[in-house]
Amino acid sequence: MKIHFITEGASCLSSLVAALSPVHEVSESGSVSEISPSIEAVVIGEHVSPTHPQWQQAQALGLPIYSYGAFLYELHKMKTRVVIAGTQGRSEIAAMVLHTMDYFSKKIDYFLESPIGNIPTCKYSPEAEFVLIEGGDTLSPIEQVPMFQLYRPTLALISHIESGKEKQYADFINTLTKGGILLYNEEDAALKVLAESTENQLRLMPYETAPHQESGGTTYLITPEGEMPLMISGKEQMNYLSGAKWLCQNLGIDEQDFYEAIETFK
């Protein structure tokens, strides 16, 4: 597939270009002359204006034009799409999930909005069954809706909702595929109300902060097998860990295996 990206400084899209290069014929930004009738998809970065010369040229040629959110859906529509959403904790939960999948050498595609430690922002392989997407609420330049409403996930997790953004997240919940799974932090009162009042036909899975205790400067996770020392600390991190655990269990990692992997997470 021949794809052109108009990135305008969006580093996450530049990473996507690099990830797709071994599989597709891709180009990035450049001049108007690069927009030709042979291009099969033009992907627009979140900060690109409709007056951008390349966007206008693509429209003049009648080329398929996608926001990057819509393109990610098209790219992964035959895979199980997993979205981590929420106004805080997205990247932390994503990091825990990716650490666990890597620990057990499980293949998973992913797309992150910003770097997490040494983890690249994007990975793509045609063989992976799952794709994990960090679902931010930046406005799409084409659809004029928050980007995370374009992914149509089968499995989603919402960590927290900032006051005033309830409608955005209610609309997001309605974009999950029917019969899909919604994991949500039930300690967030507004989120709990949204999840439990949705009319979408979903399997609801609430989670809460993982039981733990602090001793001698170390956090110990309380598990069915006893206390386990961790390399992370703090109640928020324990809440994120709980969400990551349930997400991993829905990706085929059982509870005991998750504990084995998360013990080395930092």
State where each predicted segment sits.
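Switch II (G3) loop of P-loop NTPases
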Residues: 129-142
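Active-site beta-alpha connecting loops in nucleotide-dependent enzymes
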Residues: 4-17, 21, 25, 162-165, ...
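Acidic, Mg2+-coordinating active-site environments of NTP-dependent enzymes
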Residues: 29, 34-66, 73-79, 98, ...
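A short, acidic/glycine-rich surface segment
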Residues: 117-120, 139-144, 215
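Glycine/threonine-rich beta-strand-loop-alpha-helix active-site module
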Residues: 107-132
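A generic local secondary-structure boundary/capping motif
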Residues: 119-123, 144-148, 171-173
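Walker A (P-loop) phosphate-binding motif
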Residues: 1-8, 12, 16-19, 68-116
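Conserved beta-strand positions in the Rossmann-like core of class I SAM-dependent methyltransferases
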Residues: 25-27, 109
